[in-house]
Amino acid sequence: MRTQLIFGFVLFSTSLFSMPADSINHRKWITHGALIGVSGGSLLTLQNVWYSEYNHEKFHLFNDGSNWMQMDKAGHGFTAYHITKEVSSMQRWAYNYSKPGLGVIYAMGYLTTLELMDGFSAGWGFSLFDFAANGAGAGLFLLQEKVFNKQVILPKFSYSTSNYASIRPDVLGNNFPQKLLKDYNAQ
Protein backbone atom coordinates (compact mmCIF):
# COMPACT_ATOMS: atom_id res chain seq x y z
CA MET A 1 0.00 0.00 0.00
CA ARG A 2 2.78 2.41 0.95
CA THR A 3 4.61 1.69 -2.31
CA GLN A 4 1.43 2.30 -4.30
CA LEU A 5 0.90 5.66 -2.56
CA ILE A 6 4.48 6.72 -3.26
CA PHE A 7 4.22 5.53 -6.87
CA GLY A 8 0.89 7.33 -7.28
CA PHE A 9 2.30 10.52 -5.76
CA VAL A 10 5.40 10.42 -7.98
CA LEU A 11 3.28 9.75 -11.07
CA PHE A 12 0.87 12.54 -10.14
CA SER A 13 3.75 14.94 -9.34
CA THR A 14 5.50 14.12 -12.59
CA SER A 15 2.38 14.90 -14.56
CA LEU A 16 2.03 18.20 -12.71
CA PHE A 17 5.58 19.30 -13.41
CA SER A 18 5.77 18.01 -16.97
CA MET A 19 3.49 20.73 -18.30
CA PRO A 20 4.78 22.71 -21.25
CA ALA A 21 7.28 25.45 -20.42
CA ASP A 22 4.85 28.14 -21.55
CA SER A 23 2.51 27.27 -18.69
CA ILE A 24 4.87 29.06 -16.29
CA ASN A 25 3.98 32.71 -16.27
CA HIS A 26 7.39 34.38 -16.51
CA ARG A 27 5.75 37.76 -17.01
CA LYS A 28 4.23 37.52 -13.55
CA TRP A 29 7.67 37.11 -11.97
CA ILE A 30 9.15 39.90 -14.07
CA THR A 31 6.28 42.22 -13.08
CA HIS A 32 6.52 41.46 -9.36
CA GLY A 33 10.31 41.70 -9.43
CA ALA A 34 10.18 45.05 -11.20
CA LEU A 35 7.60 46.45 -8.75
CA ILE A 36 9.58 45.28 -5.73
CA GLY A 37 12.88 46.53 -7.17
CA VAL A 38 11.61 49.94 -8.27
CA SER A 39 9.58 50.49 -5.09
CA GLY A 40 12.32 49.42 -2.72
CA GLY A 41 15.05 51.19 -4.67
CA SER A 42 13.15 54.46 -4.93
CA LEU A 43 12.19 54.46 -1.24
CA LEU A 44 15.80 53.82 -0.20
CA THR A 45 17.01 56.52 -2.58
CA LEU A 46 14.51 59.05 -1.23
CA GLN A 47 15.44 58.12 2.33
CA ASN A 48 19.12 58.80 1.58
CA VAL A 49 18.69 61.84 -0.67
CA TRP A 50 15.54 63.66 0.43
CA TYR A 51 15.10 62.82 4.12
CA SER A 52 18.73 62.48 5.26
CA GLU A 53 19.04 66.26 5.67
CA TYR A 54 16.38 66.30 8.41
CA ASN A 55 16.24 64.78 11.87
CA HIS A 56 13.71 62.08 12.64
CA GLU A 57 11.11 62.92 15.25
CA LYS A 58 7.75 61.74 16.51
CA PHE A 59 5.03 61.37 13.91
CA HIS A 60 3.30 64.68 13.24
CA LEU A 61 0.90 66.28 10.77
CA PHE A 62 1.69 69.24 8.57
CA ASN A 63 -0.95 71.51 7.05
CA ASP A 64 0.39 72.55 3.64
CA GLY A 65 -3.02 73.14 2.10
CA SER A 66 -2.31 76.78 1.30
CA ASN A 67 1.32 76.36 0.18
CA TRP A 68 2.81 76.43 -3.33
CA MET A 69 -0.45 77.46 -5.02
CA GLN A 70 -1.61 73.82 -5.07
CA MET A 71 1.13 72.79 -7.53
CA ASP A 72 2.35 70.26 -4.96
CA LYS A 73 -1.15 68.74 -4.83
CA ALA A 74 -1.29 68.60 -8.63
CA GLY A 75 2.03 66.74 -8.51
CA HIS A 76 0.67 64.26 -5.98
CA GLY A 77 -2.44 63.62 -8.06
CA PHE A 78 -0.37 63.31 -11.25
CA THR A 79 2.00 60.83 -9.61
CA ALA A 80 -0.80 58.71 -8.12
CA TYR A 81 -2.64 58.63 -11.45
CA HIS A 82 0.41 57.50 -13.39
CA ILE A 83 1.53 54.92 -10.83
CA THR A 84 -1.98 53.43 -10.92
CA LYS A 85 -1.96 53.48 -14.72
CA GLU A 86 1.45 51.81 -15.00
CA VAL A 87 0.72 49.12 -12.41
CA SER A 88 -2.57 48.34 -14.18
CA SER A 89 -0.71 48.17 -17.49
CA MET A 90 1.90 45.82 -16.01
CA GLN A 91 -0.85 43.64 -14.60
CA ARG A 92 -2.54 43.49 -17.99
CA TRP A 93 0.78 42.45 -19.57
CA ALA A 94 1.50 39.80 -16.92
CA TYR A 95 -1.95 38.28 -16.49
CA ASN A 96 -3.87 39.26 -19.65
CA TYR A 97 -6.46 41.05 -17.53
CA SER A 98 -6.49 44.11 -15.35
CA LYS A 99 -8.17 44.94 -12.09
CA PRO A 100 -7.53 48.68 -11.79
CA GLY A 101 -8.39 48.55 -8.10
CA LEU A 102 -5.11 46.71 -7.51
CA GLY A 103 -3.25 49.57 -9.18
CA VAL A 104 -5.01 51.99 -6.83
CA ILE A 105 -4.04 49.88 -3.81
CA TYR A 106 -0.41 49.76 -4.94
CA ALA A 107 -0.23 53.50 -5.70
CA MET A 108 -1.86 54.47 -2.42
CA GLY A 109 0.34 52.06 -0.47
CA TYR A 110 3.51 53.40 -2.06
CA LEU A 111 2.57 57.08 -1.74
CA THR A 112 1.27 56.64 1.81
CA THR A 113 4.68 55.19 2.68
CA LEU A 114 6.21 58.42 1.40
CA GLU A 115 3.74 60.47 3.43
CA LEU A 116 4.61 58.45 6.53
CA MET A 117 8.28 59.17 5.88
CA ASP A 118 7.28 62.85 5.73
CA GLY A 119 5.42 62.43 9.01
CA PHE A 120 8.57 61.34 10.85
CA SER A 121 10.78 64.01 9.27
CA ALA A 122 11.55 67.24 11.14
CA GLY A 123 11.47 69.18 7.87
CA TRP A 124 8.09 67.93 6.76
CA GLY A 125 5.06 66.21 8.18
CA PHE A 126 2.22 63.94 7.12
CA SER A 127 -0.08 66.05 4.97
CA LEU A 128 -3.74 65.12 4.82
CA PHE A 129 -4.00 67.32 1.72
CA ASP A 130 -1.24 65.33 -0.01
CA PHE A 131 -2.96 62.10 1.02
CA ALA A 132 -6.26 63.36 -0.45
CA ALA A 133 -4.52 64.44 -3.68
CA ASN A 134 -2.98 60.97 -3.97
CA GLY A 135 -6.44 59.45 -3.61
CA ALA A 136 -7.87 61.85 -6.19
CA GLY A 137 -5.20 60.94 -8.76
CA ALA A 138 -5.59 57.19 -8.26
CA GLY A 139 -9.37 57.61 -8.15
CA LEU A 140 -9.35 59.48 -11.47
CA PHE A 141 -7.81 56.47 -13.16
CA LEU A 142 -10.19 54.02 -11.48
CA LEU A 143 -13.27 56.13 -12.22
CA GLN A 144 -12.45 56.35 -15.92
CA GLU A 145 -11.82 52.60 -16.13
CA LYS A 146 -15.15 51.85 -14.48
CA VAL A 147 -17.23 54.45 -16.36
CA PHE A 148 -15.61 54.56 -19.82
CA ASN A 149 -13.49 51.38 -19.81
CA LYS A 150 -10.64 53.60 -21.07
CA GLN A 151 -8.78 56.75 -20.11
CA VAL A 152 -10.44 59.92 -21.39
CA ILE A 153 -8.67 62.50 -19.20
CA LEU A 154 -4.88 62.08 -19.32
CA PRO A 155 -2.91 64.24 -16.85
CA LYS A 156 0.24 65.60 -18.49
CA PHE A 157 3.38 67.34 -17.27
CA SER A 158 5.62 69.99 -18.78
CA TYR A 159 8.71 71.81 -17.55
CA SER A 160 10.61 74.89 -18.69
CA THR A 161 13.60 76.14 -16.74
CA SER A 162 12.86 79.21 -14.61
CA ASN A 163 15.26 81.88 -13.37
CA TYR A 164 14.07 81.51 -9.78
CA ALA A 165 16.09 78.36 -9.03
CA SER A 166 19.35 80.29 -9.37
CA ILE A 167 18.09 82.81 -6.79
CA ARG A 168 17.08 80.15 -4.20
CA PRO A 169 18.85 76.90 -5.12
CA ASP A 170 18.48 75.54 -1.57
CA VAL A 171 14.68 75.60 -1.95
CA LEU A 172 14.20 75.19 -5.72
CA GLY A 173 17.10 72.87 -6.55
CA ASN A 174 20.78 72.89 -7.51
CA ASN A 175 20.65 70.55 -10.50
CA PHE A 176 18.14 69.47 -13.13
CA PRO A 177 16.54 66.54 -11.24
CA GLN A 178 16.10 68.69 -8.13
CA LYS A 179 14.71 71.60 -10.14
CA LEU A 180 12.31 69.25 -11.91
CA LEU A 181 10.87 68.16 -8.56
CA LYS A 182 11.09 71.38 -6.55
CA ASP A 183 10.74 74.39 -8.87
CA TYR A 184 6.98 74.73 -9.25
CA ASN A 185 7.50 78.03 -11.09
CA ALA A 186 8.84 76.05 -14.04
CA GLN A 187 6.07 73.48 -14.26
Annotate each language-model stretch with its function.
Residues 19-187:
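Hydrophobic alpha-helical membrane segments
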Residues 1-23:
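Bacterial Sec-dependent N-terminal signal peptides
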